[in-house]
Amino acid sequence: MDKRLLVKRTLGCVCAATLMGAILATHHDSLISVKAEEKTVQTGKTDQQIGAKLVQEIREGKRGPLYAGYFRTWHDRASTGADGKQQHPENTMAEVPKEVDILFVFHDHTASDSPFWSELKDSYVHKLHQQGTALVQTIGVNELNGRTGLSKDYPDIPEGNKALAAAIVKTFVTDRGVDGLDIDIEHEFTNKRTPEEDARALNVFKEIAQLIGKNGSDKSKLLIMDTTLSVENNPIFKGIAEDLDYLLRQYYGSQGGEAEVDTINSDWNQYQNYIDASQFMIGFSFFEESAPKGNLWFDVNEYDPKNPERGKDIEGTRAKKYAEWQPSTGGLKAGIFSYAIDRDGVAHVGKEYSQRTYQELEAGLKKHPVVDNISHTDYTVSRKLKALMAEDKRYDVIDQKDIPDAALREQVIQQVGQYKGDLERYNKTLVLTVDKIHSLKGLEKLSHLQKLELCQLSNVKEVTPDILPESMKKDAELVMTGMTGLEKLNLRGLNRQTLDGIDVNGLTHLTSFDISHNSLDLSEKSADRKLLMTLMEQVSNHQKITVKNTAFENQKPKGYYPQTYDTKEGHYDVDNAEHDILTDFVFGTVTKRDTFIGDEEAFAMYKEGAIDGRQYVAKDYTYEAFRKDYQGYKVHLTASNLGESDTSKVTATTDETYLVDVFDGEKIVPHMTLHVGNGATIMENLAKGAKVIGTSGDISLAEKVVDGVVADSFWTWDTKNWIAFDLNSQVIAKEWRLFNGETDPRFKDKELNIQKGRLQILKDKTIHLENMSKDERDSYLADEQNWITVSEITSNQKIYNGSITDITSRYWRFCVDEGVSSKSPQYTELQILGQRLSSDIASTVQD
């Protein structure tokens, strides 16, 4: 989240010093500053058994939608601070109602020798267990990474992390007699955690998961993470997700959109890659006393002097929206949670208080006369929210009305979830392997299922569209193996593009099938033709083949662009006509089985295909509906002189050769060579990588114009300049090209263009420049009398193309004589186009 989530704070102390102390310590990470109690706690066997049973019920979803709350320990009447004094007598954990499934012990400002800890282990745990509420201790992630608490006493080595994990579980779970551990991971606004600290925290977290949680040795304890971080910003979550019982995501304040849940929706799209919806809980915050800006969430109703009880009403609150929200895919959420449940029923301050600061509150300013005071709560809001979720029919348990077959129902509940609302949201794979399954009725309710595997279901007699998920009509995958008892296979009208995944050889009792009205390619060489013939053979083993018991007609195969094209070289005669490369060489459509259909005539022939006189393509299927449109494709041409253009049109006026790249919008589809007439030899940019041996300007800038990249410009403060370069061997040059100043992508300024310039070669082709001293060479290269001009620029075109009549030379120079304006003339690239001479020819030329 972009905004600062200064979460889980309290400012409820009376005196100014105490107020500031609370302010500095109430972020979740303040948990790290509290020394864990050293006393050993022994809980009675009965409480251990009850707690284990509660955890099992919660984990198995038998409690329905969960409601959880964070109780701030310093607001319990038994809590005392470092001074030994009672802090707030108004509330007690003992009064938390049965509607709260999980109560989090969120401790701060509570001394290690406070009576609270004995009350927790000797009274609260027992009382809350009796009513069905589990208790979980919350600690900050810095207890795991070496920053604070126990973690400072253990080395960051495998043995040390293992010992630290054991100490954490003993101190915070076993000795306190609670039912699990919750680790809080939030964004640090100052003194941010390092990657190394997060890596250590993850290692310790994994060691804790070996001890408690669903995958731990003690499965009677819950292992939970609560966080303000999204998936991409939480490497610890990604590393431990498979071991978590629940992920509690803090969504305090508006989350965007009309329903204020946009962030939740987008986050869930990522979370569902790591956890099930039944592990996902979203949270709101009650109003904390004396909270400053940055910690005012407006998740509950604002105070109304005309209605003092408005804080107990859930209508119109964000808390209610969270209770009603469900993921669109994956399943039903586990439930919701609240922070500062001890403030349940207290209305929120109004918007007029939204900018109040710590300093103002410390000075006794901008405090609300009613809601900033501590008051006794009866947990009305929590009760209402739990009741609202419990009344949600989507949480009704799947029964025989949904899925009549008991064996099928059991497998669906195991993999999908036990609630009716899970059926329509489940979007993963369902694997059915129990031979006791006789009927598949009810699977149609799995409207988002991505893959269905039917394996060894020998007692299933038929598979028909009315009992298959709606997603089968889209892109869901169907796998059938070992279906030896299947007699009727009906996949009619499911938009199936292939029969892949269906073990047709195993359908030994098949008496009829209907695969008509799909998108299958049943042409002679396709794989589906072979599968169809096997299906017909299976039916023929039991009865005579008829139209009624073997339906495969009315196919409408979907068209695709070919992955490869056969044409690697193309040819046009010199006919002075304009030709379209896309139309002539890049065309055609293929089926899912890669059957190529080039044009409408070929499609008409394809439609005539038949099996035993029965046409398999739908008569009303048209070429226009099948063919792929190449309108969005782009063609890039490189001529023999390396001139480039983006067009599919070529006018065949002279012998030429083009290198053709066709783009489908993302990648090159085909690459081909196109010859016009007798073709032409593809030239080389001989200047690319040439050695700059002299210049009137900066040599590092000069090297940019022969690096093969149209980017940085060469320029000098003078309006005239020159560059001399060595092509490293004798060449024969036919053309040259200059990329003028406006091609610099940084400026695109025509006033930087060159108006006049000259391309030159050395008069003396036998000269050995390498034998000269640097000063001698610089003087020689700068002397105009040593050069012959072979071509000139007389216009300020963006890209100037010049002709040279088969010039042979190794050393070249380009001179800028005039720009188009008072600005220093520039150019980004110079190309000399032609071929390098073989060594024997080069020697002859030099001689």
From Swiss-Prot:
Record flagged with keyword Hydrolase: yes
Residues in LRR repeats: 423-446, 447-470, 483-506, 507-530
Positions that bind a glycoprotein: H107, E188, Q250, Y252, E288, E289, N295, Y339
Residues in GH18 domain copies: 65-377
Catalytic reaction list: an N(4)-(oligosaccharide-(1->3)-[oligosaccharide-(1->6)]-beta-D-Man-(1->4)-beta-D-GlcNAc-(1->4)-alpha-D-GlcNAc)-L-asparaginyl-[protein] + H2O = an oligosaccharide-(1->3)-[oligosaccharide-(1->6)]-beta-D-Man-(1->4)-D-GlcNAc + N(4)-(N-acetyl-beta-D-glucosaminyl)-L-asparaginyl-[protein]
One biological process term in Gene Ontology: symbiont-mediated evasion of host immune response
GO MF term set: mannosyl-glycoprotein endo-beta-N-acetylglucosaminidase activity; metal ion binding
Keywords noted in UniProt: Calcium, Glycosidase, Hydrolase, Leucine-rich repeat, Metal-binding, Repeat, Secreted, Signal, Virulence
Cell membrane among keywords: no
Catalytic residues as annotated in Swiss-Prot or TrEMBL: E186
Segments traversing the membrane: none
Pfam families per UniProt: EndoS_Ig-like (PF20746), LRR_EndoS (PF23952), TIM-barrel_EndoS (PF23916)
Function per UniProt: Endoglucosidase that acts as a host immune evasion factor by mediating hydrolysis of the N-linked glycan from the Fc region of host immunoglobulin-gamma (IgG) during infection. Specifically catalyzes the hydrolysis of the beta-1,4 linkage between the first two N-acetylglucosamine residues of the complex-type N-linked glycan located on 'Asn-297' of the Fc region of IgG antibodies (IGHG1, IGHG2, IGHG3 or IGHG4), thereby preventing interaction between IgGs and Fc receptors and ability to activate the complement pathway.
Family: Belongs to the glycosyl hydrolase 18 family.
Name of the protein described by the UniProt record: Endo-beta-N-acetylglucosaminidase EndoSd
Organism name: Streptococcus dysgalactiae
Gene field: endoSd
